């Protein structure tokens, strides 16, 4: 009884919008509603022709679609991805906002974009708001250089998987210690941390993030350390050089 449910998905948004705009034809576009290939194509065709008035969807409606008759776009929880523990979170948020906002006003009629955010003064949101690509790139590169993130330094993400949480954590901490002993001080070796998606498909996941400039040397030293450190049968290790995401 003390629990309060918050948040919403596309289905809840669809029903709420349909209730508020009773005369409008509302359609939802997400992975659950677009199980057939034809459903995706038919929905886009109906929306483009004006048979659908309001389209509610996930990121799948953000990219590469041209709707000349769209004059209003609303983005709910625009900063959701911004708070993920990933150095590219800001970049992805800026990219998504720019893409979604670009759906409005593509015809002769000017468009408007409404953005819902808990952190409206975030650089990603403010630069997207002002369509300032150059400004965003400059501040993002300054941040990356200050923190030794790509493209100024290389990053290597090591993920340790195990069905047994304690065994996986112990193996990760042992590997981290061996890496720190083997690598020169010029390479940064972060402490072991649970992955943001800590358990996936029955496997507990732990991360070790490394950063350095000489990627060939770093990769070789990681490989040599792993070769000298046998892992339990139920522990797997994955190495991702310059990972696209840290989840």
Q: PLM features: what roles do these ranges have?
A:
Residues 191-201, 237-247:
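Short proline/glycine- and acidic-rich turn/helix-capping motifs at secondary-structure junctions
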Residues 1-169, 177, 181, 185, ...:
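Inter-lobe coupling/hinge segments of SF2-like helicase ATPases
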Residues 172:
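Flexible catalytic loop/linker elements that gate and position reactive groups at enzyme active sites
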Residues 185-189, 228-242:
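Conserved short beta-strand edge segments in small beta-sheet-based binding/regulatory domains
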Residues 219-220:
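Charge-rich, low-aromatic oligomerization/scaffolding segments with amphipathic character
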């Amino acid at each position: 009884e003390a629990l309060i449910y918050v948040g919403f998905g596309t289905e809840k948004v669809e029903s709420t919008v349909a209730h508020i705009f009773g005369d409008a034809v509302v359609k939802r576009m997400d992975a659950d509603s677009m199980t057939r290939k034809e459903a995706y194509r038919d929905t886009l065709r109906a929306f483009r022709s004006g048979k659908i008035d309001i389209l509610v969807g996930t990121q799948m409606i953000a990219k590469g679609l041209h709707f000349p008759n769209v004059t209003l776009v609303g983005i709910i929880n625009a900063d959701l991805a911004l708070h993920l523990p990933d150095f590219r979170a800001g970049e992805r948020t800026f990219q998504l906002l720019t893409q979604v906002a670009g759906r409005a006003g593509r015809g002769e009629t000017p468009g408007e974009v409404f953005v819902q955010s808990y952190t409206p003064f975030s650089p990603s949101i403010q630069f997207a708001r002002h369509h300032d690509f150059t400004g965003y790139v400059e501040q993002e590169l300054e941040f990356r250089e200050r923190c030794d993130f790509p493209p100024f330094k290389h990053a290597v993400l090591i993920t340790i998987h195990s069905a047994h949480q304690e065994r996986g954590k112990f193996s990760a901490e042992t590997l981290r210690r061996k890496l720190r002993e083997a690598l020169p001080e010029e390479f940064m070796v972060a402490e072991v941390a649970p992955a943001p998606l800590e358990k996936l498909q029955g496997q507990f996941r732990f991360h070790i993030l490394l950063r350095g400039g000489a990627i060939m040397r770093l990769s070789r030293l990681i490989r040599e350390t792993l070769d000298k450190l046998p892992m339990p049968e139920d522990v797997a290790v994955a190495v991702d050089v310059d990972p696209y995401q840290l989840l």
